Amino acid sequence: MRNLSTEFKEQQNSGNRNYLKYADFTFTDGSTLSITDKDLWSNGFNFEDAVSQSGSFDIGAAIVNKLTLQINNFSGKYTDYIWDGARVVCYIGLELSTGIEKIRICTMTVTDAPYQSTAIISLTCEDSMRLFDRDYSESKLTYPATRLQIIQDACEVCGVTLQSTRFDNDDFVIQNRPNDNSITFRQVIAWVAQMGCQWAKSDEYGRLCLGWYERE
């Protein structure tokens, strides 16, 4: 859950959607770039944060969420950047009485950046859930194994930090290893989450979380 100030929540509840947008890039060569609203086209910042497929209510979803950016390249100053593989951390902000409050919303990797020398650079970015799209045959975990051990193993093999170091019924033991001839780590994660009536998602820092909807 993201930490928001009381005033930020009040502004949202009153209908204020005048969000300021920020994206900080780290390129594969180690160089960095920060862009803000003035560098983006209108409606050029779209972020998915789903834990269920569109039009359905899923238990055990493990969705790769996406971010699309459309950068204003009218001056040509961004033409020579190598966007593919860049890490991007995005924030939104609101003008409050105490100044601008920025909230981190995602950590993504640019996965599609067709070369464009035009006025618009369109980037498609995906979160760390995509890293689990590897054959489960790579896992050397011995079964029986607990739900927590299966999730820990998936994170270790795929190079993703686990945020949910404990979760409901994480000690439930699964006796038999799934047939790994044609399944991925992400499918196994979804299966483990479904067994606990939970979802799995990548948080704003790119860590794997297992949880469920908050009840107020």
What are these regions (language model features)?
Residues 131-135, 162-167:
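Short acidic/His/Gly/Ser-rich catalytic and metal-binding motifs that mark active-site loops
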Residues 205-215:
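Acidic/histidine-enriched alpha-helical segments
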Residues 168-179:
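Surface-exposed aromatic
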Residues 166-169, 203-206:
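Acidic carboxylate-rich catalytic motifs and surrounding loops in phosphoryl-/glycosyl-chemistry enzymes
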Residues 1-144, 153, 157, 177-197, ...:
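Assembly/oligomerization scaffold segments
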